[in-house]
From Swiss-Prot:
Heterodimer of HisH and HisF. This is Imidazole glycerol phosphate synthase subunit HisF. The lineage of its organism: Archaea, Methanobacteriati, Methanobacteriota, Thermococci, Thermococcales. GO terms for cellular component: cytoplasm. It catalyses: 5-[(5-phospho-1-deoxy-D-ribulos-1-ylimino)methylamino]-1-(5-phospho-beta-D-ribosyl)imidazole-4-carboxamide + L-glutamine = D-erythro-1-(imidazol-4-yl)glycerol 3-phosphate + 5-amino-1-(5-phospho-beta-D-ribosyl)imidazole-4-carboxamide + L-glutamate + H(+).
Length: 251
């Protein structure tokens, strides 16, 4: 059984981390490099940077940041937010990111998935899916969770795999930010429907939540606030998982 991955998420705006971060002994909680190094030293497996500025003029700030991160940290990192073209994807990889993710652009132009996968390789392409239960099915949302699309998230996940995505980053809008646990029914439905790795996201509040989501077959789990606020360190979380029989990297 492959080691399960713990992934930290950082929201970036104008090259700075946003969302409250209360780490002790960090001089500048807004500096992505400093936070990334902190996570790396704690044993994080991967880091995801979501660029929420994502306006065209600001893209250079993001590209410069990608270069700096690549120089300073060794754990794999993924970059996304506003990527709409094959060229943008290639440039981010060229600057040193290990993977990129797309979301809205994939829904609006599904052939982009295949084009990017053909160019940079499926292993380097993650498709992010934001979903919310609408009473009948889990509906796909785009534009940062603002726009419902009328599409079934489980069916979309299958299509994304067929088109060449190497991984799915699945966020439940119902549990996101609640700290009450991951959305187990949604995550299980997607995990059971596809053969590519699924990263569960939205709702992590304590180590038991990670255990739950790994037990239903998630390959990785992503969290932000649980780590940002220093409630649990990555190492504490991994020790807990290892004790409970989940394979994790502990070096």
């Amino acid at each position: 059984m492959l080691a399960r991955r713990i992934i930290a998420a950082l929201d970036i705006k104008d090259g700075r981390v946003v969302k409250g971060i209360k780490f002790k002994n960090i001089r500048d909680a807004g500096d992505p490099i400093e936070l990334a190094k902190r996570y790396e030293s704690e044993g994080i497996d991967e880091i995801v940077f979501l660029d929420i500025t994502a306006s065209y003029e600001k893209r250079k700030i993001l590209l410069d940041l990608v270069e700096r991160v690549a120089e300073e940290i060794y754990v794999p990192f993924t970059v996304g937010g506003g990527i709409r073209t094959v060229e943008e994807a290639r440039e981010i990889i060229r600057r040193g990111a290990d993977k990129i993710f797309i979301n809205t652009a994939a829904v609006e132009n599904p052939s982009l998935i295949k084009e990017i996968a053909d160019l940079i390789g499926s292993a380097n392409l993650v498709v992010a899916i934001d979903a919310k239960w609408n009473g009948k099915f889990w509906e796909v949302y785009t534009h940062g969770g603002r726009k419902p699309r009328g599409m079934d998230a489980v069916e979309w996940a299958k299509r994304v795999e067929e088109l060449g995505a190497g991984e799915i980053l699945l966020t439940s809008m119902d549990t996101d930010g609640t700290k009450q646990g991951f959305d187990i029914p949604l995550t299980k439905a997607v995990v059971d429907a596809v053969n590519i790795p699924v990263i569960a996201s939205g709702g992590a509040g304590k180590p038991e939540h990670f255990l739950e989501v790994f037990r239903i077959g998630s390959d990785a789990a992503l969290a932000a606030s649980i780590f940002h606020y220093g409630e649990y360190t990555v190492r504490e979380l991994k020790m807990f998982l290892a004790k409970n029989g989940i394979p994790v990297r502990l070096d």
